[in-house]
Amino acid sequence: MARAFGIVTSSGTHIKVEGLQQYRPIGAFSFLGRYRVIDFPISNMSNSGIDRIQVYVRTKPRSLAEHLGTGRHYNINSKRGKLQLMFAQNSSENDVYNTDIASFYENIEFIERMHEPYVIIAPSYMVYAEDYRELLQTHIDSGADITLLYHSVDNAREKFLNCDILNLNKQKGVESIEKNRGSAQKRNIFMDTYVMSKELFIELIKKARKISSMYTLPQIVNESSADLDIRGVSHRGYFASITDFNSYYNANISLIDIKTAEGLFNPEWPIYTKTNDSCPTQYLEGASVKNSVISNGCLIEGTVENSVIGRGCQIKAGAVIKNSIVLSLSLIHISEPTRL
């Protein structure tokens, strides 16, 4: 039993995935055919023994609520375990006021009721694997007030432009948090993952609300960096931040490569998801599939190359799919020519 409860946050108002986000939150996006993006943070928590998890959602919660259900498929449905969907009403027409702090403050009584002394906060829009037991123990052993998880990259001028970065000293103490503005290639990308005591978390929420109704959690942590002992811990392995359409596409396509996928998937660290009873994919005569991820329940008659195909798709004869992500239950076929 972990000494921490978990919080999975919704994406910030600055994150826009055009073409998808107007229909569902990023956590409910299809990922690699069979998963949803939110499966990764919840699986990390479940595998780490965290069985009391709050999932925050701001808009269009239906698809996320249907996928999460009671949480049984995440292996957290014990007598004490509970997966809670926390609704945060958008209280202002101006999104700048609809922050994560506003969501936490609106549900602060539920946070205060938690019996665990620590909280681990992770985003619903980043994909990675991490043992939070080790992260929590590192936090406790260090004596830090707050521990932040980061991933070092060497392509920050072109990628991760909607993310925060950590400025660290030689002892990996966090000196400040700021936006990645593409001014340098090597950066420590903040993975929006925090470890701290429940009491400090509540204190920061209330402090932020007093300073400004526009404050976010990264901003109040940055504001407090001079007074608190804040440490950074480096993450190893696969990491993707879904903050726009290109990053969503690239995250899916990159995992077609087996070596890349090995940095995320491990038989000893399962990624749980809602299962669907469906037959194996059928490959009919004339089908051609190369370097692709094909989910269950599909019917393939055409050509698929370097693509991710969701569950229950039909690729009809003559159709050619290349370098694409096809969402579940899609039908791809060649249109009949229009006769005048």
What residue ranges belong to the model's regions?
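Unchanged
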Residues: M1-N252
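Left-handed beta-helix
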Residues: M1-S10, R209-S335, R339
